[in-house]
Amino acid sequence: MRPWTGSWRWIMLILFAWGTLLFYIGGHLVRDNENPDHSSRELSKILAKLERLKQQNEDLRRMAESLRIPEGPIEQGAAAGRIRALEEQLLKAKEQIEMYKQQSSNAVSGLGKDHEILRRAIENGAKEFWYFVQSEVKKLKHLDRNELQRHVDEIIIDMGHQQRSVMTDLYYLSQTDGAGDWREREAKDLTDLVQRRITYLQNPKDCSKAKKLVCNINKGCGYGCQLHHVVYCFMIAYGTQRTLILESQSWRYATGGWETVFKPVSETCTDRSGSSTGHWSGEANDKNVQVVELPIVDSLHPRPPYLPLGVPEDLADRLIRLHGDPAVWWVSQFVKYLIRPQPWLEKEIEESTKKLGFKHPVIGVHVRRTDKVGTEAAFHPIEEYMVHVEEHFQLLARRMQIDKKRVYLATDDPTLLQEAKAKYPQYEFISDNSISWSAGLHNRYTENSLRGVILDIHFLSQADFLVCTFSSQVCRVAYEIMQTLHPDASAHFHSLDDIYYFGGQNAHNQLAIYPHQPRNAEEIPLEPGDIIGVAGNHWDGYSKGINRKLGRTGLYPSYKVKEKIETVKYPTYQEAEK
Protein backbone atom coordinates (compact mmCIF):
# COMPACT_ATOMS: atom_id res chain seq x y z
CA MET A 1 0.00 0.00 0.00
CA ARG A 2 1.25 3.47 -0.86
CA PRO A 3 2.13 5.41 2.33
CA TRP A 4 -0.31 8.23 1.70
CA THR A 5 -3.38 6.16 0.74
CA GLY A 6 -4.80 6.05 4.29
CA SER A 7 -4.11 9.75 4.74
CA TRP A 8 -5.88 10.54 1.47
CA ARG A 9 -8.97 8.69 2.67
CA TRP A 10 -8.82 10.75 5.85
CA ILE A 11 -8.64 13.94 3.77
CA MET A 12 -11.70 12.85 1.79
CA LEU A 13 -13.54 12.19 5.07
CA ILE A 14 -12.73 15.73 6.28
CA LEU A 15 -13.80 17.12 2.90
CA PHE A 16 -17.09 15.26 3.12
CA ALA A 17 -17.73 16.60 6.62
CA TRP A 18 -16.83 20.14 5.60
CA GLY A 19 -18.96 19.93 2.45
CA THR A 20 -21.89 18.62 4.45
CA LEU A 21 -21.59 21.52 6.90
CA LEU A 22 -21.42 24.06 4.07
CA PHE A 23 -24.38 22.47 2.29
CA TYR A 24 -26.44 22.60 5.48
CA ILE A 25 -25.53 26.20 6.36
CA GLY A 26 -25.56 27.48 2.81
CA GLY A 27 -28.89 25.83 2.06
CA HIS A 28 -30.51 27.62 4.96
CA LEU A 29 -28.87 30.95 4.17
CA VAL A 30 -29.54 31.15 0.44
CA ARG A 31 -32.93 29.43 0.34
CA ASP A 32 -34.73 32.77 0.33
CA ASN A 33 -32.59 34.09 -2.52
CA GLU A 34 -33.51 31.06 -4.65
CA ASN A 35 -37.23 31.69 -4.15
CA PRO A 36 -38.43 34.53 -6.41
CA ASP A 37 -41.69 34.84 -4.49
CA HIS A 38 -39.99 35.49 -1.14
CA SER A 39 -40.09 39.30 -1.33
CA SER A 40 -43.69 39.22 -2.44
CA ARG A 41 -44.65 36.97 0.49
CA GLU A 42 -42.79 39.22 2.94
CA LEU A 43 -44.65 42.25 1.58
CA SER A 44 -47.94 40.42 1.96
CA LYS A 45 -47.08 39.60 5.57
CA ILE A 46 -46.35 43.26 6.31
CA LEU A 47 -49.62 44.36 4.70
CA ALA A 48 -51.49 41.73 6.69
CA LYS A 49 -49.91 42.99 9.91
CA LEU A 50 -50.95 46.54 9.06
CA GLU A 51 -54.50 45.36 8.41
CA ARG A 52 -54.56 43.56 11.77
CA LEU A 53 -53.32 46.69 13.53
CA LYS A 54 -56.05 48.69 11.79
CA GLN A 55 -58.67 46.20 12.97
CA GLN A 56 -57.25 46.22 16.51
CA ASN A 57 -57.46 50.01 16.53
CA GLU A 58 -61.13 49.77 15.55
CA ASP A 59 -61.73 47.22 18.35
CA LEU A 60 -60.23 49.62 20.86
CA ARG A 61 -62.41 52.46 19.54
CA ARG A 62 -65.56 50.37 20.00
CA MET A 63 -64.41 49.33 23.48
CA ALA A 64 -63.92 52.98 24.39
CA GLU A 65 -67.48 53.71 23.22
CA SER A 66 -68.85 50.94 25.44
CA LEU A 67 -66.98 52.32 28.45
CA ARG A 68 -68.88 55.61 28.42
CA ILE A 69 -71.08 55.93 31.56
CA PRO A 70 -74.69 56.84 30.68
CA GLU A 71 -76.03 60.22 31.81
CA GLY A 72 -78.81 60.60 34.40
CA PRO A 73 -79.64 58.77 37.66
CA ILE A 74 -79.26 54.98 37.89
CA GLU A 75 -80.02 52.46 40.60
CA GLN A 76 -77.26 51.71 43.15
CA GLY A 77 -77.20 47.94 42.46
CA ALA A 78 -77.08 48.48 38.76
CA ALA A 79 -74.34 51.08 39.26
CA ALA A 80 -72.23 48.62 41.27
CA GLY A 81 -72.61 45.98 38.60
CA ARG A 82 -71.81 48.51 35.93
CA ILE A 83 -68.65 49.59 37.77
CA ARG A 84 -67.49 45.97 38.12
CA ALA A 85 -68.10 45.43 34.42
CA LEU A 86 -66.21 48.62 33.62
CA GLU A 87 -63.28 47.50 35.79
CA GLU A 88 -63.14 44.16 33.98
CA GLN A 89 -63.30 45.86 30.60
CA LEU A 90 -60.61 48.34 31.59
CA LEU A 91 -58.35 45.51 32.71
CA LYS A 92 -58.98 43.65 29.48
CA ALA A 93 -58.33 46.83 27.49
CA LYS A 94 -55.04 47.37 29.32
CA GLU A 95 -53.94 43.79 28.55
CA GLN A 96 -54.87 44.16 24.89
CA ILE A 97 -53.08 47.49 24.59
CA GLU A 98 -49.92 45.94 26.03
CA MET A 99 -50.24 43.02 23.63
CA TYR A 100 -50.76 45.35 20.65
CA LYS A 101 -47.79 47.47 21.72
CA GLN A 102 -45.62 44.35 21.89
CA GLN A 103 -46.80 43.18 18.46
CA SER A 104 -46.18 46.63 16.97
CA SER A 105 -42.73 46.76 18.58
CA ASN A 106 -41.79 43.35 17.15
CA ALA A 107 -42.97 44.46 13.73
CA VAL A 108 -40.63 47.46 13.56
CA SER A 109 -37.69 46.78 15.89
CA GLY A 110 -35.72 44.28 13.85
CA LEU A 111 -34.94 40.64 14.49
CA GLY A 112 -35.16 38.83 17.80
CA LYS A 113 -32.33 38.14 20.21
CA ASP A 114 -32.36 34.42 19.40
CA HIS A 115 -31.94 35.12 15.69
CA GLU A 116 -28.91 37.27 16.37
CA ILE A 117 -27.35 34.76 18.75
CA LEU A 118 -27.85 32.02 16.16
CA ARG A 119 -26.39 34.12 13.35
CA ARG A 120 -23.23 34.73 15.36
CA ALA A 121 -23.06 31.08 16.41
CA ILE A 122 -23.12 29.97 12.76
CA GLU A 123 -20.41 32.48 11.93
CA ASN A 124 -18.22 31.37 14.82
CA GLY A 125 -18.88 27.69 14.14
CA ALA A 126 -17.87 28.03 10.52
CA LYS A 127 -14.67 29.84 11.48
CA GLU A 128 -13.74 27.32 14.16
CA PHE A 129 -14.37 24.42 11.76
CA TRP A 130 -12.15 26.14 9.22
CA TYR A 131 -9.36 26.55 11.78
CA PHE A 132 -9.66 22.85 12.55
CA VAL A 133 -9.60 21.68 8.94
CA GLN A 134 -6.67 23.95 8.09
CA SER A 135 -4.68 22.66 11.04
CA GLU A 136 -5.39 18.97 10.49
CA VAL A 137 -4.92 18.93 6.74
CA LYS A 138 -1.64 20.85 7.00
CA LYS A 139 -0.31 18.09 9.25
CA LEU A 140 -0.76 15.60 6.41
CA LYS A 141 1.78 17.47 4.33
CA HIS A 142 4.53 15.79 6.28
CA LEU A 143 3.35 12.24 5.50
CA ASP A 144 4.48 12.35 1.86
CA ARG A 145 6.16 14.83 -0.39
CA ASN A 146 4.90 15.06 -3.93
CA GLU A 147 1.34 14.29 -4.95
CA LEU A 148 -0.13 14.37 -1.45
CA GLN A 149 1.28 17.82 -0.77
CA ARG A 150 -0.15 19.16 -4.04
CA HIS A 151 -3.58 17.76 -3.22
CA VAL A 152 -3.51 19.19 0.28
CA ASP A 153 -2.64 22.66 -1.07
CA GLU A 154 -5.52 22.46 -3.52
CA ILE A 155 -7.90 21.35 -0.77
CA ILE A 156 -6.98 24.29 1.43
CA ILE A 157 -7.47 26.74 -1.47
CA ASP A 158 -10.85 25.24 -2.41
CA MET A 159 -12.03 25.15 1.17
CA GLY A 160 -10.99 28.78 1.56
CA HIS A 161 -13.27 29.72 -1.34
CA GLN A 162 -16.16 27.85 0.25
CA GLN A 163 -15.55 29.35 3.67
CA ARG A 164 -15.55 32.88 2.22
CA SER A 165 -18.76 32.08 0.39
CA VAL A 166 -20.47 31.11 3.64
CA MET A 167 -19.11 34.18 5.43
CA THR A 168 -20.36 36.42 2.62
CA ASP A 169 -23.83 34.86 2.85
CA LEU A 170 -23.77 35.48 6.58
CA TYR A 171 -22.85 39.12 6.03
CA TYR A 172 -25.78 39.67 3.69
CA LEU A 173 -28.06 37.79 6.08
CA SER A 174 -27.06 40.25 8.78
CA GLN A 175 -28.22 43.16 6.61
CA THR A 176 -31.57 41.77 5.44
CA ASP A 177 -35.07 42.85 6.48
CA GLY A 178 -33.83 46.19 7.78
CA ALA A 179 -31.58 44.47 10.34
CA GLY A 180 -28.58 46.60 9.40
CA ASP A 181 -30.56 49.80 9.91
CA TRP A 182 -31.93 48.47 13.19
CA ARG A 183 -28.41 47.76 14.47
CA GLU A 184 -27.31 51.29 13.63
CA ARG A 185 -30.25 52.76 15.53
CA GLU A 186 -29.94 50.43 18.50
CA ALA A 187 -26.18 50.97 18.81
CA LYS A 188 -26.69 54.74 18.77
CA ASP A 189 -29.53 54.56 21.31
CA LEU A 190 -27.50 52.40 23.71
CA THR A 191 -24.38 54.52 23.30
CA ASP A 192 -26.30 57.75 23.88
CA LEU A 193 -27.95 56.25 26.96
CA VAL A 194 -24.67 55.15 28.55
CA GLN A 195 -22.87 58.39 27.68
CA ARG A 196 -25.70 60.39 29.29
CA ARG A 197 -25.39 58.32 32.45
CA ILE A 198 -21.62 58.78 32.58
CA THR A 199 -21.93 62.52 31.95
CA TYR A 200 -24.51 62.82 34.74
CA LEU A 201 -22.27 60.97 37.19
CA GLN A 202 -19.22 63.03 36.27
CA ASN A 203 -20.88 66.42 36.61
CA PRO A 204 -22.56 66.66 40.03
CA LYS A 205 -24.36 69.91 40.87
CA ASP A 206 -22.45 70.31 44.13
CA CYS A 207 -18.91 68.93 44.00
CA SER A 208 -18.32 69.62 47.69
CA LYS A 209 -21.02 67.11 48.63
CA ALA A 210 -20.44 64.53 45.89
CA LYS A 211 -19.00 61.12 46.68
CA LYS A 212 -15.70 60.71 44.85
CA LEU A 213 -13.29 58.02 43.76
CA VAL A 214 -9.69 59.12 43.24
CA CYS A 215 -7.54 57.46 40.57
CA ASN A 216 -3.88 58.31 39.92
CA ILE A 217 -2.86 57.78 36.30
CA ASN A 218 0.83 57.16 36.96
CA LYS A 219 0.80 53.39 37.02
CA GLY A 220 4.25 52.10 36.09
CA CYS A 221 3.51 51.00 32.53
CA GLY A 222 2.89 52.29 28.99
CA TYR A 223 0.03 54.34 27.54
CA GLY A 224 -2.33 51.46 26.74
CA CYS A 225 -1.84 49.99 30.20
CA GLN A 226 -2.37 53.38 31.88
CA LEU A 227 -5.54 54.01 29.87
CA HIS A 228 -6.89 50.62 30.94
CA HIS A 229 -5.99 51.49 34.53
CA VAL A 230 -8.17 54.61 34.30
CA VAL A 231 -10.97 52.59 32.65
CA TYR A 232 -10.88 50.15 35.58
CA CYS A 233 -11.14 53.07 38.02
CA PHE A 234 -13.98 54.56 35.99
CA MET A 235 -16.01 51.34 35.97
CA ILE A 236 -15.78 51.04 39.75
CA ALA A 237 -16.66 54.73 40.14
CA TYR A 238 -19.72 54.16 37.93
CA GLY A 239 -20.74 51.04 39.86
CA THR A 240 -20.37 52.69 43.28
CA GLN A 241 -22.01 55.98 42.15
CA ARG A 242 -18.89 58.06 42.79
CA THR A 243 -17.57 60.85 40.59
CA LEU A 244 -14.16 59.89 39.18
CA ILE A 245 -11.38 62.30 40.14
CA LEU A 246 -8.41 61.67 37.83
CA GLU A 247 -5.05 62.77 39.23
CA SER A 248 -2.73 63.23 36.27
CA GLN A 249 -0.33 66.05 37.13
CA SER A 250 3.27 65.13 36.29
CA TRP A 251 2.00 62.40 33.97
CA ARG A 252 4.98 60.56 32.49
CA TYR A 253 3.72 61.22 28.97
CA ALA A 254 2.58 64.85 29.43
CA THR A 255 3.60 66.80 32.51
CA GLY A 256 0.61 69.13 32.12
CA GLY A 257 -1.72 66.22 32.76
CA TRP A 258 -4.52 64.34 31.01
CA GLU A 259 -6.46 67.52 30.25
CA THR A 260 -3.73 68.85 27.96
CA VAL A 261 -4.43 65.97 25.55
CA PHE A 262 -8.02 64.89 26.18
CA LYS A 263 -11.07 66.69 27.51
CA PRO A 264 -11.44 66.76 31.32
CA VAL A 265 -13.33 63.83 32.82
CA SER A 266 -15.56 66.40 34.55
CA GLU A 267 -16.64 69.97 33.86
CA THR A 268 -17.91 70.61 37.40
CA CYS A 269 -15.90 68.44 39.80
CA THR A 270 -12.12 68.01 39.66
CA ASP A 271 -11.36 68.73 43.34
CA ARG A 272 -10.63 65.67 45.47
CA SER A 273 -11.37 67.40 48.79
CA GLY A 274 -14.11 66.07 51.07
CA SER A 275 -15.24 65.67 54.67
CA SER A 276 -13.63 62.22 54.93
CA THR A 277 -11.01 60.30 52.97
CA GLY A 278 -9.95 56.66 52.99
CA HIS A 279 -8.37 53.89 50.97
CA TRP A 280 -10.61 51.37 49.23
CA SER A 281 -11.96 48.80 51.69
CA GLY A 282 -15.04 47.63 49.80
CA GLU A 283 -18.27 49.29 48.68
CA ALA A 284 -20.18 48.54 51.89
CA ASN A 285 -17.31 49.53 54.20
CA ASP A 286 -16.77 52.80 52.32
CA LYS A 287 -20.44 53.75 52.47
CA ASN A 288 -19.86 56.72 54.79
CA VAL A 289 -16.52 57.83 53.33
CA GLN A 290 -16.84 60.75 50.92
CA VAL A 291 -13.50 60.40 49.11
CA VAL A 292 -12.10 56.93 48.36
CA GLU A 293 -8.65 56.34 46.88
CA LEU A 294 -8.41 53.33 44.56
CA PRO A 295 -5.25 51.20 44.22
CA ILE A 296 -4.09 49.50 41.02
CA VAL A 297 -6.21 46.48 40.15
CA ASP A 298 -3.44 44.07 41.18
CA SER A 299 -3.79 45.27 44.80
CA LEU A 300 -7.58 45.61 44.87
CA HIS A 301 -9.22 43.92 47.85
CA PRO A 302 -12.04 43.19 48.25
CA ARG A 303 -12.92 42.94 44.57
CA PRO A 304 -16.28 44.47 43.62
CA PRO A 305 -18.54 42.95 40.94
CA TYR A 306 -18.04 45.93 38.60
CA LEU A 307 -14.84 44.65 36.99
CA PRO A 308 -14.83 43.33 33.42
CA LEU A 309 -16.14 41.12 31.95
CA GLY A 310 -19.52 41.84 33.58
CA VAL A 311 -22.22 43.89 31.82
CA PRO A 312 -25.10 45.91 33.31
CA GLU A 313 -28.13 43.81 34.15
CA ASP A 314 -30.57 46.41 32.80
CA LEU A 315 -28.83 46.53 29.39
CA ALA A 316 -27.82 42.87 29.06
CA ASP A 317 -30.66 41.64 26.84
CA ARG A 318 -30.26 44.53 24.43
CA LEU A 319 -26.47 44.11 24.32
CA ILE A 320 -26.63 40.35 23.77
CA ARG A 321 -28.99 40.96 20.88
CA LEU A 322 -26.86 43.72 19.36
CA HIS A 323 -23.25 42.74 19.95
CA GLY A 324 -21.09 39.64 19.68
CA ASP A 325 -19.05 40.53 22.77
CA PRO A 326 -21.13 42.65 25.19
CA ALA A 327 -18.27 42.87 27.71
CA VAL A 328 -15.99 44.57 25.17
CA TRP A 329 -18.80 46.94 24.17
CA TRP A 330 -19.27 47.93 27.82
CA VAL A 331 -15.54 48.60 28.32
CA SER A 332 -15.49 50.60 25.09
CA GLN A 333 -18.07 53.07 26.42
CA PHE A 334 -15.67 54.22 29.14
CA VAL A 335 -12.80 54.42 26.65
CA LYS A 336 -15.02 56.52 24.37
CA TYR A 337 -15.73 59.04 27.14
CA LEU A 338 -12.12 59.22 28.30
CA ILE A 339 -10.38 59.83 24.96
CA ARG A 340 -12.46 62.75 23.67
CA PRO A 341 -9.66 64.77 22.04
CA GLN A 342 -8.70 68.36 22.70
CA PRO A 343 -9.00 70.58 19.57
CA TRP A 344 -5.24 70.46 18.84
CA LEU A 345 -5.28 66.65 18.86
CA GLU A 346 -8.38 66.54 16.67
CA LYS A 347 -6.59 68.77 14.17
CA GLU A 348 -3.46 66.60 14.36
CA ILE A 349 -5.53 63.50 13.53
CA GLU A 350 -7.17 65.23 10.54
CA GLU A 351 -3.82 66.42 9.18
CA SER A 352 -2.20 62.99 9.62
CA THR A 353 -5.12 61.33 7.82
CA LYS A 354 -4.52 63.54 4.78
CA LYS A 355 -0.73 63.33 4.95
CA LEU A 356 -0.66 59.52 5.12
CA GLY A 357 -3.40 59.05 2.53
CA PHE A 358 -5.42 56.90 4.92
CA LYS A 359 -8.58 55.63 3.21
CA HIS A 360 -10.71 52.52 2.88
CA PRO A 361 -10.57 49.64 2.33
CA VAL A 362 -7.65 49.20 4.70
CA ILE A 363 -6.54 46.55 7.17
CA GLY A 364 -4.72 47.53 10.34
CA VAL A 365 -1.65 45.54 11.39
CA HIS A 366 0.03 46.09 14.75
CA VAL A 367 3.40 44.40 15.27
CA ARG A 368 4.72 44.73 18.81
CA ARG A 369 8.39 43.95 19.29
CA THR A 370 10.90 45.56 21.77
CA ASP A 371 9.96 44.93 25.42
CA LYS A 372 7.12 42.43 24.83
CA VAL A 373 9.08 39.82 22.87
CA GLY A 374 10.55 37.11 25.05
CA THR A 375 8.62 38.19 28.16
CA GLU A 376 4.88 38.63 27.56
CA ALA A 377 4.71 37.57 23.91
CA ALA A 378 6.46 35.44 21.29
CA PHE A 379 8.16 36.82 18.18
CA HIS A 380 5.87 36.77 15.14
CA PRO A 381 7.36 37.45 11.67
CA ILE A 382 5.47 39.73 9.29
CA GLU A 383 4.48 36.69 7.21
CA GLU A 384 2.18 35.47 10.00
CA TYR A 385 0.25 38.73 9.96
CA MET A 386 0.02 38.96 6.18
CA VAL A 387 -1.62 35.54 5.84
CA HIS A 388 -4.66 36.93 7.65
CA VAL A 389 -4.47 40.26 5.82
CA GLU A 390 -4.69 38.46 2.46
CA GLU A 391 -7.52 36.21 3.66
CA HIS A 392 -9.59 39.19 4.73
CA PHE A 393 -8.98 41.12 1.52
CA GLN A 394 -10.23 38.06 -0.39
CA LEU A 395 -13.33 38.11 1.79
CA LEU A 396 -13.86 41.86 1.30
CA ALA A 397 -13.52 41.39 -2.47
CA ARG A 398 -16.70 39.30 -2.41
CA ARG A 399 -18.79 42.34 -1.51
CA MET A 400 -16.83 45.42 -2.63
CA GLN A 401 -14.39 46.68 -5.25
CA ILE A 402 -10.80 46.59 -3.97
CA ASP A 403 -8.88 49.31 -5.82
CA LYS A 404 -5.76 48.85 -3.68
CA LYS A 405 -4.88 46.48 -0.88
CA ARG A 406 -3.93 48.99 1.80
CA VAL A 407 -2.35 48.07 5.12
CA TYR A 408 -1.88 50.48 7.99
CA LEU A 409 1.27 49.23 9.71
CA ALA A 410 1.85 50.25 13.32
CA THR A 411 5.01 48.96 14.96
CA ASP A 412 7.76 49.85 17.40
CA ASP A 413 10.32 48.27 15.02
CA PRO A 414 11.56 50.98 12.59
CA THR A 415 13.04 48.38 10.20
CA LEU A 416 9.78 46.53 9.61
CA LEU A 417 8.23 48.95 7.08
CA GLN A 418 10.96 48.44 4.49
CA GLU A 419 10.91 44.69 5.08
CA ALA A 420 7.16 44.57 4.52
CA LYS A 421 7.35 46.67 1.34
CA ALA A 422 10.10 44.45 -0.08
CA LYS A 423 8.28 41.20 0.67
CA TYR A 424 4.78 42.36 -0.32
CA PRO A 425 5.05 44.83 -3.24
CA GLN A 426 1.41 44.20 -4.22
CA TYR A 427 0.25 45.97 -1.05
CA GLU A 428 0.24 49.67 -0.24
CA PHE A 429 1.67 50.10 3.26
CA ILE A 430 0.59 53.21 5.15
CA SER A 431 2.88 54.00 8.06
CA ASP A 432 4.73 56.80 9.82
CA ASN A 433 8.23 55.59 10.60
CA SER A 434 8.81 58.49 13.00
CA ILE A 435 6.15 56.93 15.24
CA SER A 436 8.08 53.65 15.20
CA TRP A 437 11.23 55.45 16.34
CA SER A 438 9.38 57.31 19.10
CA ALA A 439 7.87 54.02 20.33
CA GLY A 440 11.32 52.64 21.18
CA LEU A 441 12.12 52.11 24.84
CA HIS A 442 14.56 55.05 25.00
CA ASN A 443 11.94 57.50 23.66
CA ARG A 444 8.74 56.01 25.05
CA TYR A 445 7.75 58.42 27.83
CA THR A 446 7.71 61.67 25.85
CA GLU A 447 4.96 63.87 24.46
CA ASN A 448 6.09 62.97 20.93
CA SER A 449 5.78 59.28 21.77
CA LEU A 450 2.31 59.90 23.24
CA ARG A 451 1.24 61.64 20.03
CA GLY A 452 2.55 58.69 18.04
CA VAL A 453 0.79 55.97 20.01
CA ILE A 454 -2.50 57.92 19.98
CA LEU A 455 -2.29 58.26 16.18
CA ASP A 456 -1.42 54.59 15.73
CA ILE A 457 -4.36 53.51 17.89
CA HIS A 458 -6.68 55.88 16.05
CA PHE A 459 -5.81 54.53 12.60
CA LEU A 460 -5.85 50.90 13.75
CA SER A 461 -9.34 51.41 15.18
CA GLN A 462 -10.51 53.03 11.91
CA ALA A 463 -9.41 50.04 9.81
CA ASP A 464 -11.89 47.58 8.29
CA PHE A 465 -10.16 44.69 10.05
CA LEU A 466 -7.41 44.35 12.65
CA VAL A 467 -4.55 41.83 12.70
CA CYS A 468 -2.42 41.96 15.83
CA THR A 469 -1.54 40.25 19.10
CA PHE A 470 -4.02 40.76 21.92
CA SER A 471 -1.15 40.39 24.37
CA SER A 472 -0.51 44.03 23.45
CA GLN A 473 -2.52 46.70 25.27
CA VAL A 474 -2.29 49.00 22.23
CA CYS A 475 -3.99 46.38 20.09
CA ARG A 476 -6.75 45.83 22.66
CA VAL A 477 -7.38 49.58 23.00
CA ALA A 478 -7.71 49.88 19.20
CA TYR A 479 -10.16 46.97 19.22
CA GLU A 480 -12.18 48.61 22.01
CA ILE A 481 -12.40 51.92 20.15
CA MET A 482 -13.41 50.02 17.01
CA GLN A 483 -16.55 48.88 18.88
CA THR A 484 -17.67 52.51 19.24
CA LEU A 485 -17.44 53.06 15.47
CA HIS A 486 -19.67 50.16 14.36
CA PRO A 487 -22.84 48.56 15.71
CA ASP A 488 -20.95 45.27 16.13
CA ALA A 489 -17.23 45.01 15.32
CA SER A 490 -16.65 42.07 17.65
CA ALA A 491 -15.47 39.84 14.77
CA HIS A 492 -13.33 42.47 13.00
CA PHE A 493 -10.00 41.09 14.20
CA HIS A 494 -7.55 38.23 14.20
CA SER A 495 -5.16 37.87 17.11
CA LEU A 496 -2.01 35.81 16.65
CA ASP A 497 -1.92 34.95 20.34
CA ASP A 498 -4.42 35.74 23.10
CA ILE A 499 -8.17 36.11 23.07
CA TYR A 500 -9.48 39.48 24.26
CA TYR A 501 -8.98 40.11 27.95
CA PHE A 502 -8.89 43.04 30.36
CA GLY A 503 -6.04 43.04 32.87
CA GLY A 504 -7.40 42.26 36.33
CA GLN A 505 -10.73 41.01 34.99
CA ASN A 506 -12.96 38.60 36.84
CA ALA A 507 -13.08 35.00 35.59
CA HIS A 508 -13.81 34.49 31.90
CA ASN A 509 -16.16 31.52 31.72
CA GLN A 510 -17.76 29.56 28.93
CA LEU A 511 -20.68 27.14 29.03
CA ALA A 512 -20.50 23.70 27.42
CA ILE A 513 -23.36 23.11 24.97
CA TYR A 514 -22.21 19.76 23.52
CA PRO A 515 -20.60 16.72 25.16
CA HIS A 516 -16.99 15.86 24.42
CA GLN A 517 -15.01 12.71 25.07
CA PRO A 518 -11.21 13.23 25.14
CA ARG A 519 -9.28 11.50 22.37
CA ASN A 520 -5.89 11.96 24.02
CA ALA A 521 -4.32 13.00 27.31
CA GLU A 522 -4.28 16.68 26.32
CA GLU A 523 -8.07 16.97 26.05
CA ILE A 524 -10.72 17.30 28.77
CA PRO A 525 -14.27 15.92 28.87
CA LEU A 526 -17.33 18.16 28.57
CA GLU A 527 -20.98 17.69 29.41
CA PRO A 528 -23.69 20.22 28.51
CA GLY A 529 -23.95 22.76 31.32
CA ASP A 530 -20.33 22.42 32.46
CA ILE A 531 -18.65 25.75 33.20
CA ILE A 532 -15.25 26.15 31.56
CA GLY A 533 -12.74 28.78 32.66
CA VAL A 534 -11.17 29.67 29.32
CA ALA A 535 -7.43 30.31 29.13
CA GLY A 536 -7.18 30.89 25.39
CA ASN A 537 -8.11 29.92 21.85
CA HIS A 538 -5.43 28.10 19.89
CA TRP A 539 -7.07 29.23 16.60
CA ASP A 540 -6.98 25.65 15.31
CA GLY A 541 -10.46 24.56 16.34
CA TYR A 542 -9.45 23.98 19.96
CA SER A 543 -9.43 26.15 23.07
CA LYS A 544 -7.72 25.58 26.39
CA GLY A 545 -9.36 25.91 29.77
CA ILE A 546 -10.37 24.29 33.02
CA ASN A 547 -13.56 22.29 33.54
CA ARG A 548 -14.57 23.82 36.87
CA LYS A 549 -16.72 20.84 37.84
CA LEU A 550 -13.91 18.34 37.33
CA GLY A 551 -10.96 20.60 38.10
CA ARG A 552 -9.22 19.35 34.95
CA THR A 553 -7.30 21.60 32.55
CA GLY A 554 -6.82 20.84 28.88
CA LEU A 555 -8.04 21.26 25.32
CA TYR A 556 -11.61 21.09 24.03
CA PRO A 557 -13.30 21.84 20.66
CA SER A 558 -14.13 25.55 20.58
CA TYR A 559 -17.51 25.03 18.92
CA LYS A 560 -18.75 22.91 21.83
CA VAL A 561 -19.00 25.90 24.17
CA LYS A 562 -20.59 29.34 24.21
CA GLU A 563 -19.76 32.49 26.15
CA LYS A 564 -21.26 32.76 29.63
CA ILE A 565 -22.39 36.38 29.89
CA GLU A 566 -22.03 37.70 33.43
CA THR A 567 -24.55 40.37 34.40
CA VAL A 568 -23.98 42.89 37.19
CA LYS A 569 -26.51 45.03 39.03
CA TYR A 570 -25.09 48.43 38.10
CA PRO A 571 -26.95 51.62 39.05
CA THR A 572 -29.27 52.82 36.27
CA TYR A 573 -29.00 56.59 36.89
CA GLN A 574 -32.64 57.40 36.17
CA GLU A 575 -31.86 61.02 37.11
CA ALA A 576 -29.83 61.31 33.90
CA GLU A 577 -33.07 61.07 31.88
CA LYS A 578 -34.79 63.99 33.63
Swiss-Prot record:
One of its GO terms (molecular function) is SH3 domain binding. It comes from the Eukaryota. CDD domains: Fut8_like, SH3_Fut8. Pfam families: FUT8_N_cat, SH3_9. Residues 505-566 form the SH3 domain. Its EC number is 2.4.1.68. Pathway: Protein modification; protein glycosylation. One of its GO terms (biological process) is protein N-linked glycosylation via asparagine. Disulfide bonds join 207-269, 215-233, 221-225, 468-475. The keyword Transcription regulation does not apply. It is a single-pass type II membrane protein. Keywords: Disulfide bond, Glycosyltransferase, Golgi apparatus, Membrane, SH3 domain, SH3-binding, Signal-anchor, Transferase, Transmembrane, Transmembrane helix. The chain crosses the membrane at residues 10-30. A motif (SH3-binding) lies at residues 302-308. Residues 1-9 are cytoplasmic. It is found in: Golgi apparatus, Golgi stack membrane. Gene3D superfamilies: 3.40.50.11350, ESAT-6-like (1.10.287.1060), SH3 Domains (2.30.30.40). It catalyses: N(4)-{beta-D-GlcNAc-(1->2)-alpha-D-Man-(1->3)-[beta-D-GlcNAc-(1->2)-alpha-D-Man-(1->6)]-beta-D-Man-(1->4)-beta-D-GlcNAc-(1->4)-beta-D-GlcNAc}-L-asparaginyl-[protein] + GDP-beta-L-fucose = an N(4)-{beta-D-GlcNAc-(1->2)-alpha-D-Man-(1->3)-[beta-D-GlcNAc-(1->2)-alpha-D-Man-(1->6)]-beta-D-Man-(1->4)-beta-D-GlcNAc-(1->4)-[alpha-L-Fuc-(1->6)]-beta-D-GlcNAc}-L-asparaginyl-[protein] + GDP + H(+). Residues 368-369 are annotated as: Important for donor substrate binding. InterPro entries: Fut8, Fut8_N_cat, Fut8_SH3, GT23_dom, SH3-like_dom_sf, SH3_domain. Residues 209-496 form the GT23 domain. One of its GO terms (cellular component) is Golgi cisterna membrane. Catalyzes the addition of fucose in alpha 1-6 linkage to the first GlcNAc residue, next to the peptide chains in N-glycans. Belongs to the glycosyltransferase 23 family. This is Alpha-(1,6)-fucosyltransferase. It comes from Xenopus tropicalis.
